[in-house]
Curated annotation (Swiss-Prot):
Mg(2+) binds at E163. Its cofactor is FMN; NADPH; Mg(2+). Substrate binds at R11, K12, S99, Q100, R101, Q162. The gene is fni. InterPro entries: Aldolase_TIM, FMN-dep_DH, IPdP_isomerase. GO terms for biological process: isoprenoid biosynthetic process. It is an enzyme of class 5 (isomerase). Homooctamer. Dimer of tetramers. Keywords: Cytoplasm, Flavoprotein, FMN, Isomerase, Isoprene biosynthesis, Magnesium, Metal-binding, NADP. One of its GO terms (cellular component) is cytoplasm. Belongs to the IPP isomerase type 2 family. This is Isopentenyl-diphosphate delta-isomerase. Transmembrane segments: none annotated.
Length: 342
């Protein structure tokens, strides 16, 4: 068991290092630069009156941003997450926590979040579990993960490509729809379904809408590509390493995934992430109909430096979003929906 935990910790450390490598970014597939908003030369509004308030789980939120789930369960995670949570406490951003998988078998692992929760009790946090773990985990155990963290909701991460390439991957997803439907019916918290960089098709989104999930974070192609990351880790396994290269461009991009979701007029909230680099990219997702936008790599890079750098990054993103709104004549986020170039 100890060896298993050591392997888990090493994998999480590897992920941080590899996620920052340019070769593991699918920037060449990023769709945002090919999508424009309509410029308004005479915006009839005052910049200071612009509001970026949004709705999350049918309640108003001051900021429409979330730091996407990134890291937990290793020695470097505490400092990274402390900086992220401190910044969130000052800006009212929400945050998805790193994997809580280890907490299912190691009761001590939950204590990683205890001091952070004590120091930053008002931060809106989202629990994190992979779809493969959901299948075999009692709902009561999942509820404990949420309760221990005092989380607002649960994010279920879907990562079939990553699991195929990862040397330690879990590739048995059989029963995932049945488990997900049972979770949505029985859990006391909102359930969010999130991809990890490969996006969603219309058919999958329709099924998710039918079972009643609270939100879908589309997380499409255009940013960190986990197939490429695991390909680096599998460099001594010729089959997985070659497969990673074959699938290096696999997935549905973030803008198309968002369009797929919005076209259904779903009952779930549409969240946008995957290659979102700045506030202008965020504005484009809001223009398509997203209500929350997630950032990962820009925040990880900042958190490796300092809390101050995270705050600076957040402030820049917010100002860029407001600038996009001002230059399209949009006082509130909903106004952006009329400003997408045809």
């Amino acid at each position: 068991m100890q060896n298993e935990y050591s392997q888990f910790e090493q994998r999480k450390r590897d992920h941080i290092e590899l996620a920052l490598m340019p070769a593991n970014q699918s920037n060449e597939l990023n769709p945002f630069d090919h999508f424009s908003l309509v410029h308004e030369a005479l915006p009839d509004l005052d910049f200071k009156d612009i509001s970026i308030q949004s709705i999350r789980f049918k309640k108003p939120v001051e900021k429409p941003f979330i730091i996407s789930s990134m890291t937990a369960g290793h020695s470097n995670a505490l400092e990274i997450n402390s900086r992220l949570m401190e910044a969130c406490s000052k800006t009212k951003w929400a945050m998805g926590v790193g994997s809580q998988r280890r907490e299912l078998s190691d009761k001590q692992a939950a204590f990683e979040w205890a001091p952070l929760r004590r120091d930053f009790p008002m931060v809106s946090l989202f629990s994190n579990l992979g779809i493969a773990q959901l299948i075999d985990t009692p709902i009561s155990a999942i509820q404990r993960l949420i309760d221990t963290l005092q989380a607002e909701a649960l994010i279920i991460h879907c990562n079939p490509l990553q699991e195929c390439i990862q040397p330690e991957g879990t590739t048995n997803f059989q029963g995932c729809w049945t488990a997900l439907e049972a979770l949505v019916k029985k859990i006391a918290s909102p359930v969010i379904i999130k991809e990890t960089g490969c996006g969603f098709s219309k058919n999958t989104l329709l099924r998710l809408n039918n079972i009643g999930v609270a939100a879908v974070d589309v997380s499409g192609v255009g940013g960190t590509h986990w197939g490429r990351i695991e390909g680096h880790r599998a460099n001594k396994d010729p089959i997985r390493h070659r497969t990673a290269d074959t699938f290096r461009n696999w997935g549905i991009d973030t803008l198309q995934s968002t369009r797929n979701a919005i076209s259904l007029n779903p009952s779930f909230e549409v969240w946008g992430s995957g290659g979102v680099r700045n506030g202008l990219d965020a504005a484009k997702l809001f223009a398509l109909g997203a209500t929350t936008v997630g950032f990962a790599k820009p925040m990880l890079e900042a958190a490796l430096d300092s809390t101050g750098q995270v705050l600076t990054q957040m402030n820049i993103i917010e100002y860029e979003l407001k600038t996009a709104m001002f230059c399209t004549g949009s006082r509130v986020l909903d106004d952006l929906k009329e400003k997408a170039c045809p």
